[in-house]
């Protein structure tokens, strides 16, 4: 009887371990390209987490950052020539109908492209010689993590885009006091932008690019602020440095001047500032719990038909 109980306990423990990884995508190496990064998003703010050790890149998206701007891309001449087009088609003169349409139906603008804000870059000096690496995306929690070991110190990053606080939140911690040291910067593909210190924030501002003759009208602003547990935080005009901390939490918000397709008169600075202030009021543990609870109200409404192929497997080798 005793042996049966021990066996049952072992089986239950194995089932619980398998369950913990049921809906996790996990890898044993950082992403090398964008398509290998782990996606996070709250429907407005998105992030692609590469999981780099020495140099981490978290590419940032905001749903209203587009090239070009409000304009009319239908031709005012189209309605007037529509009877002629019909006449030619009914007469079997399709080529002539195509020519009339090409000359009168199109304006040269085919829609505006979605564009990135850029990336948040994290630099960890002295982390090149690492072991026990793992990065994962927990689909049940909408939380990504990166774990590795440097010498005898274990490092963990936890990343999520809060559904509640409208912010990207990153916690970096180590199991040795004072071992968290890193530098945060921005990278952006735009030619015209500004990065500067604004109080305790590091600010990136710019605007979408011109497209098909339409000037870029969408302005964006991204704000980053860091809270450290012990240690020091120093904000300069191009980076934020954290030294000697036990842990640190990075808060990133972004906003644009977009109101609707015809109106881009909103104040992106005020929006980004308000998002950041709200996010930083909530302690990290409470922010994570609030995010998970809000996400579960959506995710918990459905159940995957089958995800046994994910169970206890490294995704990079099996999918």
Identify the residue ranges that each predicted region occupies.
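Bacterial Sec-dependent N-terminal signal peptides
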Residues: 1-21
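Accessory carbohydrate-recognition regions in carbohydrate-active enzymes
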Residues: 21-169, 173-182, 187-192, 196-199, ...
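Low-complexity, Ser/Thr/Pro/Gly-enriched N-terminal "stalk/linker" regions
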Residues: 24-25, 305, 317
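Generic recognition of stable, solvent-exposed alpha-helical segments in well-folded globular domains
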Residues: 40, 80, 167, 247, ...
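Extended acidic/polar, glycine-enriched regions
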Residues: 173-272
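Short, cationic low-complexity segments
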Residues: 270-289
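An acidic-aromatic substrate-binding cleft motif
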Residues: 286-306, 310
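Single conserved hydrophobic/aromatic residue that forms the stacking wall/gate
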Residues: 309, 316-319
């Amino acid at each position: 009887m005793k042996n049966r109980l021990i066996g049952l306990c072992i089986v239950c423990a194995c089932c619980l371990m398998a369950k913990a990884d049921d809906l996790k995508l996990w890898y044993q190496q950082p992403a090398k390209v964008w398509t290998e990064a782990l996606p996070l998003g709250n429907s407005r703010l998105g992030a692609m987490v590469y999981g780099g050790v020495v140099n981490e890149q978290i590419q940032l998206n905001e749903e209203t950052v587009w090239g070009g701007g409000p304009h009319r891309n239908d031709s005012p001449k189209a309605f007037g020539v529509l009877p002629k087009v019909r006449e030619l088609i009914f007469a079997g003169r399709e080529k002539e109908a195509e020519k009339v349409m090409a000359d009168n139906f199109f304006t040269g603008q085919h829609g505006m492209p979605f564009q990135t804000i850029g990336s948040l870059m994290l630099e960890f000096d002295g982390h090149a010689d690492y072991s026990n690496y793992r990065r994962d995306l927990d689909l049940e929690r909408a939380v990504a993590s990166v774990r590795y070991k440097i010498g005898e110190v274990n490092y963990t990053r936890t990343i999520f885009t809060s559904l509640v606080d409208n912010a990207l939140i990153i916690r970096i911690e180590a199991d040795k006091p004072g071992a968290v040291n890193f530098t945060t910067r921005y990278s952006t593909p735009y030619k015209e932008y500004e990065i500067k210190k604004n109080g305790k924030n590091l600010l990136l501002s710019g605007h979408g690019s011109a497209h098909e003759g339409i000037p870029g009208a969408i302005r964006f602003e991204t704000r980053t602020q860091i809270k450290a547990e012990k240690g020091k935080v120093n904000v300069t005009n191009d980076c934020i440095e954290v030294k000697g901390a036990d842990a640190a939490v990075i808060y990133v918000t972004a906003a644009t001047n977009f109101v609707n397709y015809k109106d881009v008169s909103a104040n992106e600075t005020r929006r980004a500032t308000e998002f950041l202030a709200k996010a930083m009021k909530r302690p990290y543990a409470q922010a994570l719990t609030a995010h998970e609870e809000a996400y579960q109200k959506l995710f918990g409404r459905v159940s995957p038909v089958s995800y046994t192929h994910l169970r206890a497997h490294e995704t990079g080798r099996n999918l």
